From Swiss-Prot:
Keywords: Disulfide bond, Electron transport, Redox-active center, Transport. It comes from the Bacteria. GO terms for cellular component: cytoplasm. Pfam families: Thioredoxin (PF00085). NCBIfam families: thioredoxin. Residues 1-105 form the Thioredoxin domain. The keyword Transport applies. InterPro entries: Thioredoxin, Thioredoxin-like_sf, Thioredoxin_CS, Thioredoxin_domain. GO terms for molecular function: protein-disulfide reductase activity. This is Thioredoxin. Component of the thioredoxin-thioredoxin reductase system. Participates in various redox reactions through the reversible oxidation of its active center dithiol to a disulfide and catalyzes dithiol-disulfide exchange reactions. Disulfide bonds join 30-33.
Length: 105
């Protein structure tokens, strides 16, 4: 299961992480976001020693998505060494995400 990150915990969990971090920005009402849940869960398990995978509900945590320019969801961002390195927008296939993550880390 993927852990949640909040506006309050974002700095500690993401920006100060020793591992690269994938953040899935989502909302409860978003159909494609719900379709992405099992894919994100699988990726989290498969890459648990290489990356940290977190989810952020944009309705409960509006500050961070606004700061990073999240305009549509699902949006998946990769952070490394405290910086945003890359972004994917929309529903993604597992293979596409794995290739993107492995290339980026």
């Amino acid at each position: 299961m993927v852990n949640n990150v909040t506006d309050i915990s974002f700095k500690n969990e993401v920006l100060e992480s020793d591992l690269p971090v994938i953040v899935d920005f989502w909302a409860e009402w978003c159909g494609p976001c719900k379709m992405l849940i099992p894919i994100i869960d699988e990726i989290s398990k498969e890459l648990q020693d290489k990356v940290k995978v977190l989810k952020m509900n944009i309705d409960e945590n509006p500050k961070t998505p606004s700061e990073y320019g999240v305009r549509s969801i699902p949006t998946i961002m990769l952070f490394k060494n405290g910086e945003q390195k890359d972004t994917k927008i929309g529903l993604q296939q597992k293979k596409s995400l794995l290739d993107w993550i492995n290339k980026s880390i």
